[in-house]
């Protein structure tokens, strides 16, 4: 199904150049194996959307939005993971999103061209799977990709400005993941509603 494909790809990119990442101190802990907090954070938004869809909350008018949010949430997470891991492994230059100063790989709130492009490709791939499976149509697939990139940029801003700062010790990666992925789902749904309103 949909989530297993995401897990396989995520696991593969996490292990890319793992020795190099470990030497630089930017590798995921436990060889990339996710703990309970990470699993919950990564799947919470998707699970909520799935439950809302299963129980037909809001009726038929909302059914399409819940499915769209489901797909967008996983597109956002996969894009986030792929961009981060590819950036750590192959990013030539890493920039802080707030100042565009060059910073070391793995810095919170930093991005690279290689990682960003890989994240867009990953999100597009997963949106394409959603389209093939009939979960989203083509315009909705595009919205999933757009929403994932906006949400991931927001996550980078949070990482650069708040994470690891005094008073925000509670804002760990798991919490940021929940915010990021939920934002991707909500943004896709909002953009869909705006698109429908504009067409009508």
Please report, for each region that a protein language model flagged, where it lies by residue.
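Hydrophobic alpha-helical transmembrane segments
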Residues: 1-200
